[in-house]
Amino acid sequence: MNGHAKPPFPKQKQPMPGRTSDMRPQPDHGEDSYRGSGKLAGKKAVITGADSGIGRAVAIAFAREGADVLIAYLSEHDDANETKRLVEDAGRKAVLMSGDIGDPAQCRAVIEKAVSELGGLDILVNNAAHQASFKSLEDISDDEWELTFQVNIHAMFYLTKAAVPHMKNGGAIINTASINADKPNPTLLAYATIKGAEFHRRAPAVAGREGNSRKHGGARADLDAAYSFDHA
């Protein structure tokens, strides 16, 4: 983590959805350490949740490997613009698209904008997530359960469905899963349930497209500062 603070980090709380720009110290997304080698030269990618956290790190890596990127995010405009700057600093095109991917129409609009403004689509990274911490099952409201599935599972389906027809010569669909799929945190029941549902490695591999899920452990991001704000 060149130039970045090392753990343990001070605990911080923010209202949803959280802001990377407000975190102290700032997370490390590979800004100073990642070096590309042209592995994605000329590729076009959509990354959801690319304003911060793992999504921003993926956007930086993809751009430094030669890909143009559509950055899909909810409403964190300052964070998204910083990711855009980092992509453009790597010499690649960056397109911003804000909105709630829990809405199927927004999912279709994201893909349409990528195809229109990037000139095609080769890679879809389903990374955006919603999570909230609750002390017990009884504390999870119906609306919270539905929201978790809309953002984490339904959006993945609608984005993939919209993307596949544009991947004429193959492509890649990558889903960000979680260690919670195997070792669920008891305070993250809804989130752990959907991450278990996501981790079916070959499910998106339809009509010649490569499909993968990638499980991650702890990653310091604005979501961590926000998810327990109202519920802990």
Locate each region found by the language model.
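Canonical Rossmann dinucleotide-binding motif of NAD(H)/NADP(H)-dependent dehydrogenases/reductases
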Residues: 37-70
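Catalytic loop of short-chain dehydrogenase/reductase
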Residues: 129-131, 174-212, 221-222
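Conserved amphipathic alpha-helix within the SDR
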Residues: 84, 88, 95-98, 103-119
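Amphipathic alpha-helical dimer-interface segment in Rossmann-like NAD(P)H-dependent oxidoreductases
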Residues: 60, 112, 151-171, 204-209
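Conserved glycine-rich Rossmann-like NAD(P)H-binding loop of the short-chain dehydrogenase/reductase
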Residues: 67-82
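Conserved mid-core segment of classical short-chain dehydrogenase/reductases
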Residues: 8, 103, 108, 116, ...
